[in-house]
Amino acid sequence: MARFSSISDTLESDDSGIKVLFAVDGCAVSFSLALLTGQIPSTNSVYVIGYWDPSDRFSSIPFLDGDPNTNERISTTVCNLEDVPSPLRVEFCLLNQMASGMGGADLKLRTRAIFVCRFTSWSEMNAIANSIIYGTPIQAGVLQATISETETFMLHDEFNLALHVFLNGLSLKGRNKKDVCMSLNHNYISSVSENFPRGKRGLTGLYLQHEQKVTAAYRRIYGGSTTTAFWYVSKFGPDEKSLVLALRYYLLQAQEEVTGIATGYDLQAIKDICKTYAVSVNPNPTGFLAADLTSFSRLSRFCCLSYYSKGSVAIAFPSYVERRIMADIAEVDALREYIERDRPSLKISDLEFVKYIYLAYFECYNREQLKRHLKDVTVSLPDEDIYKKSSLGKCAVENFFTHVRSRLNVNDHIAHNVLPEQVEMGNKLVRKFGRARMYLSTTMTNESHFTGICECASVILKRLDTLEMKLQKYGWPSDRVDGSNLMADNQNNSTLIPYDKSRSSGMILECSNTHSRGGPMIVKRLLALVSADSRAGGIGPANMLMGIDSAIDGPLPVYRVGMSKGRQAFTVLMTECWERTIPSPGSAKAHLIKLNNSYGTSTEDLISRDLFLTSEIEQLIGSTVELPEITCGSADEQQYINRNEVFNGNLAIGNIVLDVDIHLRNPIPLRLMHAAIRGFRSGILRALALLLPKANIDHGSYPCYFYKSSCKKSRVMGGAPWMLHDAELAPDYSMFENAEFDLEMGIDDPLLIDQIDESLTRWSSESSRSVDLDPDKPCGCHDKIGLRVCIPVPSPYLLVGSKTLAGLSRIIQQAVLLERNFVETIGPYLKNYEIIDSGVYGHGRSLRLPFFGKIDENGIVSRRLVPFFVIPDDCADMEKFIVAHFEPKNFHFHSSIPLEKAAIILKDIGGEYAGFFERKITVNRDIFFGTRLSLSIALRERGVDINDCAAITTFVTDHILDDIITYVYEHIPDHAIEYQNLSVSCCVVKSDWILLQLIPNKTIGYRHGFTCVRFKHARARRASARSYLALNVDAHGRLCVCVIQQCFAAKCGNNKLRTLFTVDIDSKCRLEHQ
């Protein structure tokens, strides 16, 4: 038998040879061990399932088709091997314990060579060539004759030696593996290793003595002992292209590629890439279908005879995989580049930025975009170029990023995204409207005495019940709670309020008959009374409320007073002695005269002037009207320590009051803070000038009044761990109103801030009140700077409605974040870009007044709001501007303003200025996933009208409540007694969800609420949690009810809503119907 070269010569060759994945009828591992030890019969057959020849040695051999009429015929023609180099090195491989289609660069190789053959003679090379090209089985005798023992046992000698050492130790020590491991010391291993013969002799000895153990050990590193033809078809098929190309590439080529681009891609990814490799080939000569591949013999012939396994189609596929992956990555990198480029300039909150990223990827990778991309990267020729053929990134820019970038310029942002809705009514009509819908002027001027009422919640509640009963004979609604919000949209749709994502989570829309009299909605019932029209002579409900005989010719303010221990009181006044808390404007003017213009009037250093005046006036306030350090008095006393104006959606707005919280990474130096707030003012005025084009706003002189929470100067008394909720938390449902209800996420109350560890802020004696005016000294606010910003509504405009003010605050925030003087100055110190709270403008929400402090759970007073001067550059009368900070009419929402030129009412601000990402997500969701079934339709199908709160309550009581109680008894038995004899009260009704409160049975002792299900708390808060039912439709169109709980404890998330469990109502209703 002729030989072309010796084995020793070929060992020095760099030729990697051909890799063959083979199979046998039976266990491939047992077959291989028998072959390596010379125990295999020569008649056994080996089948080639797939192969990879980097040198493409058989490309010059003509392919001979089988007879299409007989699937069993295979060509036995001797191949022309003149162009095939000799000797031919072939690695026979098995699966490397690949249990699934999971890939990864850090995983072991997917196939592993188990023996190596060198084919040298014509007959040997013809046998392997026929097996590779035509799928002809190769006989075991040929493999025995051609096996390269030197190369083969280089693969196994170390493993065989380890087996020998272990099995020898096992025979000495028995089957106690622990003892075996302990006995394998260095000397023992060395002595045993020296006597072990390498190569075929060593493996044969092991195999003959320990056949089962050796076979089991090899099966641990080689797969193929249990794989079948069906396994290959199901894993890599079922179509021919995927079965041939994906099998070869995934098992034999991917991890050997020099670039390694596709190494980490799993099998499904490779199969998906096969689908866009649309190169046409002739049908498989065997004519087999996937269902016919029931044996390795047929599978081998099917794969080897396939036109996908040879020629340019097979050679070009690995290159196409790399090019396709590079094309995909290029589009993704382009998207990532745009996002990284936008991030520094797109000043939005972290939550909104996360939505922005998700939406950006969705815009690029939705169904239509993916179809277009896959069409662009599909090839019909093996070497077709796909570089930059995809338009994925370009479409993303056109469809999404261009719109987003319009937010980066305040002029374009307002011009393209904001649609103010206004009505020009003429001065005469607007003046009458303003006088009827703004506070009496006497309420905002200082008087010698207080006229009004200030009582705790329980007393106010009794007063309201009695008064409303008397007013029924005058036409007052018998079940009226808050009165219809006259300025709110949808006022004629008292119950069904369409959800508007431009509203903040704190804004309020409420059904008209949510609660009967005696319910907890104290605030809104007061607002309805004080804003009701009077009869002739100025006598109306407000007179009866306060017991005043004199005429009241206009609305009155309502205040909420926070008290210690979580209590609260409510104030309605007609006259007030404001000097009990606010220094008189005269004292401020006198102090400025005393300074004798030492602060200067030049504009050379505006920041130093502002800093000096802020410090001096703060000292004046502390020495003139000092708040107590701790309070525990009556409501009459505590109303001069803490007072919160309640926003009345029925009234017109005279001042734009912004609640600003600037969350900090680190304390900011005083000079930088004053410079940043000056930029903040510029952003406000720029936004107002664009929104209100007919207003004459002079940027150099228009007044903006700033008030800042006093710094934390000491830690005299920290908050106790049992502080569970803010003293300013109103006991109504305003925190749930007008919020998109997310069953997986908590809803934070905007008032729950700085509730733990509040420190005292005191002004000490005059001698110790000297202030360090070092401009580089950091502000004492380490975590947050709290500001109250008040801007008079410019003439000729008048604003109405909470929605208008909330929208205006969002636009101002966007404008401020686009103001370079603000962002570049304070940007390094900002923790996030959510700085203006737009949730404080809901009907019934309250906001603390300047000059008043906060009262925490223990009655400690802190965080007093004091003037923070930002004097306009062209201020004509600086003294007048400073004194104006002390006038109550300048920092109330509904205080009257000059109406001589008022002629336009701004009643709404629409457009996509806010909630752009949410709106876009909703539109895309409806397009690609279908419109979700609305709650109103789901209830209508069950005979319930969403506009009828009584019907909703009856439906829940009759069909749902029993299931809830049963579930609690089964799964939460420790709390079951609390849920006996429950009643339900409808709290919030919206188009997409309904919130109902579970009211416990007071006869069993749970008067204040339920116990927390999630945690056990201290005795004082053991029964302070609230439980609710949330009725909504899930993503699958099923009507569901969620049982949620709100606990005020810090470990429960401080007032966040937590879902306890969900009940599917549809299934129960269907059973009852049947």
From Swiss-Prot:
Domain of life: Viruses
EC id: 2.7.7.-
UniProt subcellular location: Host nucleus
Entry annotated with the keyword GTP-binding: no
Keywords: DNA replication, Host nucleus, Metal-binding, Transferase, Zinc, Zinc-finger
Family (UniProt): Belongs to the herpesviridae DNA primase family.
HAMAP family cross-referenced by the UniProt entry: HSV_PRIM
Role noted for this protein: Essential component of the helicase/primase complex. Unwinds the DNA at the replication forks and generates single-stranded DNA for both leading and lagging strand synthesis. The primase initiates primer synthesis and thereby produces large amount of short RNA primers on the lagging strand that the polymerase elongates using dNTPs.
Subunit comment: Associates with the helicase and the primase-associated factor to form the helicase-primase factor.
Name of protein: DNA primase
